[in-house]
Amino acid sequence: MRAVAVSAFGEQPQLMDLPQPEPGPGEVLVRLAAAGLNPVDWKLADGMFGDAVQAAFPLVMGTDGAGEVVAVGPGVRRFTVGDPVFGQFQRPERGGGSYCELAVADENSLAPAARSVTYATSAAVPTAGMTAYNLVEETRIGEGRRVLIVGATGGVGTFATQLAAGRGAEVIATARPAKAELMRTLGAAETVDHTAGPVADQVLAAHPDGVDVLIDMASGPEEFIELTRTVRDGGTAVSLIGSADADVLTEHNLRGFNFVNRPSPQLLDILAGHLDAGRLTVLVGREVPLEEAPEELAASRTGRAQGKTVLAI
């Protein structure tokens, strides 16, 4: 089968011809129609997680995907052959990923795909969508809460903006002027141009009483602490990239933490329901053939990628 893989950590991804995997107990084999590209894909392939990840090579890249079940292993109860599914396929210890024609996944890493959208749309959802949903849950966002989302125009940010607004929160999203109207259509009450000056100063000028929740997907430790000036006494500040210092936040009487995602099939079911109900918009910036994955990964590494990239398989 065709697959985009690396032969060792740090090697360049290449289109390879690899053997078809076979499902074991509790596993399903999926013929993938599309795979979603996430920054974590190239970070894993580059070996950025160190000893925390044990991998077999060649390592097929990719986590997110969508397609049709073509075989099931012993003991599988949730799916049968022919079912449309979406979810997470990255299994580095077995060299498995989603940038390929056929992939094996644990049945509990998948859910029935939404019926009202394409496989390409479904493939763009799992990692970013579950991250955003868990963020909104863990920061207790609800009716009347004011939320500042930094890095709002990315995959997680656009989902978090929609989910928070859908719960009745007042969302302030960072966005360049060219993306401001888009963010408002996704539910942001207002936007802040992070290129026009310190975000904290702009937010406090408009809202001297601050925000209830800060969700930051982009700032380093110093910038993150600066942004916590916007958070009201007793509020919540969360970093997605490990910038939160719990001791410092406690000194400022803030609840805060470095977010760790907890994926589950139940979350995938919820997201599929949102898609079918029209409550979640998925912004696919580019859809390209599988063989162009190396170029798209290079663009993602440099930050040149625009919108969510999906690989058509």
Where would I find each of the regions flagged by the language model?
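Glycine-rich helix-loop-beta junction characteristic of Rossmann-like nucleotide cofactor-binding loops
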Residues: 137-141, 206-208, 229
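Glycine-rich phosphate-binding loop and adjacent beta-alpha segment
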Residues: 218-280, 313
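Glycine-rich beta-strand-centered segment in the early N-terminal region that forms part
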Residues: 19-37, 49-91
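Mid-domain Rossmann-like dinucleotide-binding core that forms the NAD(H)/NADP(H) cofactor-binding site
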Residues: 123-196
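C-terminal hydrophobic helical "lid"/dimerization subdomain
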Residues: 1, 268-313
